[in-house]
Amino acid sequence: RLCRIVLPDDAVWSLSADCLTAATPRGRVEFVIGEGERLHVRGQGLTVTFALEGSRYDYAYVTPQGAQCVVAAGEDLRLLPRVTSGKVTVTGEWRRDHADNVAMSFSGAEGFEGTIDLFPAIPPEPTTDSFDQARAGAADDFADWLSRTPEGGQTEARSLAAYLLWANTVPASGNLTRPAIYMSKNAMINIWSWDNAFSALGVAAMDPDLAFDQFAAIYDHQHPSGLLPDFVNDRESYFAFTKPPVHGWAILRLIEDHPDWLTEARRATLVPWLERQLSYWLTYARKDAESLPAYCHGNESGWDNATFFAEGGPVLTPDLPTFLILTCDCLAVLDSARADHWQAEGSRLATLLDTLWTGEAFGTRLTADPTRLRQDESLIGFIPLLLGSRLAP
């Protein structure tokens, strides 16, 4: 969404963990992500242009130090290109209060090598690393990450899974209080408040601290009511929706698979987070203590377009009390002094969950039509299997 890379139409692209390459019979251009928010670029026989996709008030200017700087106003970002060989040209057509067709082009009769720094305010100092050094650093970093990735499955699948977790990790910045694993760096540039739990499970063996950070990146923005935001990114915390409370289940899995992960400091931090989250669902998402909590919108369930929301909401579903029961089980482990309290709370929810049992399967109810127990072919009816022995025979 920031730049369009302009190269000849016959360019063939190839990708490794450390380098993206575009090649034609006439030459090639290589791209490497360096330290911080820096892109290294090197080319031979070709010109590469980074053309801003365009937003109101984009423009380019020359800094007091004589450097050419591009402002992507819609992204609230500045870009400063530099070269150590070849040349870089910044262009734009001034239109009273902005520039159209803003672009940066790298070229050179003998090839070129340079960088683009992305920054919000003050440009960083020029790097002393060459392209080859930056590439070697990226390769070493990924090799170290891959070496800590558990064995299993097909070799290529393991490598790709490790790469996605490594490449989608962004540093703490702006609204992000911790290093966070985005779901994608293309369109889904957020950390959603249930995806974070699965990311934590995925990286716990490689980096226990990063696994904890995935919980903290969301819980650091927990509303005083206990509500978690739908997602967070470096700019905002979004509360129009939330996501299902899978975190107790995920933490139980982490403790089972990696017992050393649960330090006393983490235990002391997790308990109030989970307690407030449970309180939100039991206080604000249901009518009274004799009722099940409900999802108001499909987006909150994680089953965004599921059939059980075809008639609207709020909807009583079997997965939500299941996750809350597992939250109680998790709190009983983390907060052993009050284990009886949490187990009793879980038992009360289990009794209420039975009201969604048809005799053959779990169904759903609309809060506006609570006497009608609906059943369809959604997999949501199988989520209570996570409760194991808590289910009545």
Predicted regions and their residues:
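Structural helix-adjacent loops and short alpha-helical linkers that scaffold large soluble proteins
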Residues: 151-154, 203-215, 254-275, 289, ...
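Substrate-binding groove/exosite segments of carbohydrate-active enzymes
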Residues: 147-252, 375-387
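Acidic/polar, glycine-enriched structural segments that form the non-catalytic walls/loops
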Residues: 35-38, 42-189, 259-260, 268-280, ...
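The feature captures the catalytic groove of carbohydrate-active enzymes
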Residues: 108-111, 115, 124, 225, ...
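Long, well-ordered core segments of solenoidal/helical folds
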Residues: 164-173, 207-227, 270-290, 344-361, ...
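Carbohydrate-active enzyme catalytic cores, enriched for enzymes
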Residues: 362-393
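An extended acidic
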Residues: 1-35, 141
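Short alpha-helical segments and helix-capping/turn motifs at coil-helix boundaries
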Residues: 100-102, 197-198, 369
